Amino acid sequence: MIRNIIIIFFSFVLLACQEQSQNKIAIVIHGGAGTMKKENMTPELEESYLLKLEEAIRVGYEILKNGGSSQDAVEKTIHIMENSPLFNAGHGAVLTSDGSAELDASFMNGETLNAGAVAGVTNVKNPISAAIAVMEKSPYVLLSSKGAEEFASDVGLELVPNSYFITERRKTQLENIQNKNEVAFYDSYIKDSKYGTVGCVALDINGNISAGTSTGGRSNKKWGRLGDVPVIGAGTYADNECCGISATGWGEFFIRNVVSYDIAALVNYKNLNIKEASRIALNKVKDLGGDGGVIVLDKNGDVSMDFNTAGMYR
């Protein structure tokens, strides 16, 4: 059984040192963690994942290399993944019990500690941009559902029909789950259907850290279920004083443990390195029965990519 499973936590990291200022720039991304059956992870599909992740991180890296902000790098990097059918975010997101897509995203600016998030949106092409707009153009941190969609329209974000997000792969996945008469956390493509969530953390030449995360949530979800992604401190956190974090995993457990903030607090207040802090936070999730992973980037440009699942693909 185990031999028929491939564990994946697709993650990439790029680091560089600017010659003029010697300030380090860095960017790290993930495309989700989980367990994929061997028959579903063909060499061609694996190559597609890797190429898309490489494309995404190159976009963000070029922004940083040219002196751009970590915020811009995170947003544009996540756009690439949201626009791809490969990931559980934007186009290609998992479907709710009624066959529609409901999307969540969050963003945090480590310089100002400003943050924004949207939850349960159904017509915003790039939810990460909506999250940033909430941060920049509203007095709020989190907007949901119809209100978030109205706000996105008011600020001029691109809107699309819900059918844009729906792919045959996800329709088949939902049908398979519903035929088993279960609100499944696991599915035939990826063990945790939230895995596939995308995230990015970046450090720019000015020492500013930004973090963002985007997801379609959980396949066959009901009743407006929300996970950790739109919850600042659970799925996303950033603070220039310590680090930035983007998480992927069993959202209910990440909310209960406030995983992203917990990592930042352990670094900030106990002076732990990001590897130690990540391990402690994820072990707490595991102790409660949850699993998942995080990418963490600290103010020095050091990176940690940790998980408490059975394995990790890098």
Residue spans of the language-model regions?
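Alpha/propeptide regions of enzymes that mature by internal proteolysis
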Residues: 20-314
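Bacterial Sec-dependent N-terminal signal peptides
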Residues: 1-23
